[in-house]
Amino acid sequence: MDLKQIAGEYAATFVKDGMKIGLGTGSTAYWTIQKLGQRVKEGLSIQAVPTSKETEALAQQLNIPLISLNDVQSLDLTIDGADEIDSNLQLIKGGGGALLREKIVASSSKELIIIVDESKVVTRLGTFPLPIEIIPFAWKQTESKIQSLGCQTTLRLKNNETFITDNNNMIIDCIFPNHIPTPSDLHKRLKMITGVVETGLFVNMTSKAIIGTKNGIQEL
């Protein structure tokens, strides 16, 4: 079985009857959602908030009841993937382009469980390009200010056209030559740039990490 599938399906066991949950986006969260769809079919009663249009479509296909985050005060649990995770449970997310909604849903949850395969575990964040969601207006000005923090930037494309997020924004992917020694500081500096909507740095948000390894499940 695929390591992502092992981690994703295991994470679904943390969802209990009556919970309001956040559904992540990406290839690992896909397996959690599939497993939850199976459990709903077997009688599990939950309500879910999707973190992307892609996840919303999958949940509807599996008959998982969906709600709006506007209609609840908080969620019991969110299960989502990550592009990188370190030993302090700091993350880079946004490889799939859903980082803003993922962060809103995660920050509205009492608990955030991150599911990854062992290839995503790193000693220091930053080998994977850091996604930054920006507004389209004057985007080159915003990109220039991001570059002034010492990174190489690339405007994200899809099918040779500018990638547009579910929120009608753009994404700049950033590589920092010396990785990211202090993610919380970098996040704050990026958020101070006018035009930056959100960063893919998730700091002090993760409750638990479930890692699919060749030797089975590992929890951090």
Curated annotation (Swiss-Prot):
<feature type="binding site">
    <location>
        <begin position="25"/>
        <end position="28"/>
    </location>
    <ligand>
        <name>substrate</name>
    </ligand>
</feature>
<feature type="binding site">
    <location>
        <position position="120"/>
    </location>
    <ligand>
        <name>substrate</name>
    </ligand>
</feature>
<keyword id="KW-0413">Isomerase</keyword>
<comment type="function">
    <text>Catalyzes the reversible conversion of ribose-5-phosphate to ribulose 5-phosphate.</text>
</comment>
<feature type="binding site">
    <location>
        <begin position="93"/>
        <end position="96"/>
    </location>
    <ligand>
        <name>substrate</name>
    </ligand>
</feature>
<dbReference type="GO" id="GO:0004751">
    <property type="term" value="F:ribose-5-phosphate isomerase activity"/>
</dbReference>
<feature type="binding site">
    <location>
        <begin position="80"/>
        <end position="83"/>
    </location>
    <ligand>
        <name>substrate</name>
    </ligand>
</feature>
<comment type="pathway">
    <text>Carbohydrate degradation; pentose phosphate pathway; D-ribose 5-phosphate from D-ribulose 5-phosphate (non-oxidative stage): step 1/1.</text>
</comment>
<dbReference type="InterPro" id="IPR050262">
    <property type="entry name" value="Ribose-5P_isomerase"/>
</dbReference>
<dbReference type="InterPro" id="IPR004788">
    <property type="entry name" value="Ribose5P_isomerase_type_A"/>
</dbReference>
<comment type="subunit">
    <text>Homodimer.</text>
</comment>
<feature type="active site" description="Proton acceptor">
    <location>
        <position position="102"/>
    </location>
</feature>
<comment type="similarity">
    <text>Belongs to the ribose 5-phosphate isomerase family.</text>
</comment>
<protein>
    <recommendedName>
        <fullName>Ribose-5-phosphate isomerase A</fullName>
        <ecNumber>5.3.1.6</ecNumber>
    </recommendedName>
</protein>
<dbReference type="Pfam" id="PF06026">
    <property type="entry name" value="Rib_5-P_isom_A"/>
</dbReference>
<dbReference type="InterPro" id="IPR037171">
    <property type="entry name" value="NagB/RpiA_transferase-like"/>
</dbReference>
<dbReference type="InterPro" id="IPR020672">
    <property type="entry name" value="Ribose5P_isomerase_typA_subgr"/>
</dbReference>
<dbReference type="GO" id="GO:0009052">
    <property type="term" value="P:pentose-phosphate shunt, non-oxidative branch"/>
</dbReference>
